[in-house]
Amino acid sequence: MSDQISIIAPDDWHVHLRDGEMLNQVVAHTARRFQRAIVMPNLRPPVTTVAAAQAYRDRIQAACPADLEFTPLMTAYLTDSIAPAELETGFREGVFAAAKLYPANATTNSAAGVTDLLQIDPVLETMARIGMPLLIHGEVTDPEIDIFDREAAFIERHLEPLRERHPELKVVLEHITTEQAVQYVSSADRHLAATITPHHLHINRNAMFAGGLRSDFYCLPVAKRECHRQALRRAATSGDPSFFLGTDTAPHERSSKESACGCAGIFNAPFALESYAQVFDQEGALEHFEAFTSLNGPAFYKLPANTHRITLQRRDHLVPELVNGLVPFHAGEILSWAVANAPDQVQL
């Protein structure tokens, strides 16, 4: 059993870096572990123009410590009225790496999202033509659909018809949580991929209610039954190039998590890579770890893999209860892998 693994420097294909003071608090945690990151556009107001994306990218780079090599990859927030020309300009100028589809009111800051997929077909046609990936929060918002069934319903009702209408469109089904999503992506062609978070590999829905209401485990999509968690673990560790790393790290102040109407999101950036490594180790699949963290994502986005390497060591360490005042995923738990030469708690 190896006590050390070396991998090509990884990327994170789904992050929420927030803005303002929260951006200053969290960006270095992503930048210390990942060389590139796909940055979600659900700010207030959302990032819907090239100029807004450029300005947000500038703020991210200004907040990132100068000694870290980190490239934020910006995304456009799709609305019912967004212009195809705006997306094409941003993509061709290298400002937009992808566009994000939020069904209206599906998750945090998604009120301005798309209400009717047919209405944005001209946008999707443009994206397919220029090779711009579509990133999807794949849940229906129909209140009659149980929250635990909303991902499976989205695939059947919306994703499959969308892909039939736009067969050449590159699509990432983000933060998948169900066995149905695993099966759908596994059986699809090269134009469809999926990201998987560390928390959905570690917890099932029981975690939210263990001994009380555990708001730190509340995220969207919500964690599902144990059978779905096991399907995700098999997919992530399989070596299938359709699946790659996307943490969906989503920090919130404690007052926003612990309230009568708490926010969805798990802040996992500080120890995400170590969290993934533990899963691959437990599944006896460390030989596929580098592909999931460092190769499959760049291949899908048609970007070169990073050139330098990082090393992880088998070393038990305690995850702190708080990091910069925020509760990290695995708070108070012991992880069995650590990035070499990195302190157990990054001081920023």
Curated annotation (Swiss-Prot):
Listed GO biological process terms: 'de novo' pyrimidine nucleobase biosynthetic process; 'de novo' UMP biosynthetic process
GO MF annotation: an example: zinc ion binding
Modified residues (N6-carboxylysine): 100
Keyword terms, alphabetized: Hydrolase, Metal-binding, Pyrimidine biosynthesis, Zinc
Any one Pfam family match given in the protein's UniProt record, by short name: Amidohydro_1
Cofactor or coenzyme needed: Zn(2+)
Sequence positions that bind Zn(2+) 2: 100, 137, 175
Annotated active site: 248
Binding sites annotated in the UniProt record for substrate: 16-18, 42, 137, 220, 252, 264
EC number(s) from the headed UniProt entry: 3.5.2.3
Catalysis: reaction(s): (S)-dihydroorotate + H2O = N-carbamoyl-L-aspartate + H(+)
Transmembrane segments: none
Domain of life, source organism: Bacteria
Cofactor note: Binds 2 Zn(2+) ions per subunit.
Pathway participation: Pyrimidine metabolism; UMP biosynthesis via de novo pathway; (S)-dihydroorotate from bicarbonate: step 3/3
Gene3D superfamilies: Metal-dependent hydrolases
Metal-binding as UniProt keyword: yes
First-level EC class: hydrolase
Subunit structure of this chain's protein: Homodimer.
Stated family: Belongs to the metallo-dependent hydrolases superfamily. DHOase family. Class II DHOase subfamily.
Protein name, UniProt field: Dihydroorotase
Species of origin: Synechococcus sp. (strain CC9605)
Taxonomic classification: Bacteria, Bacillati, Cyanobacteriota, Cyanophyceae, Synechococcales
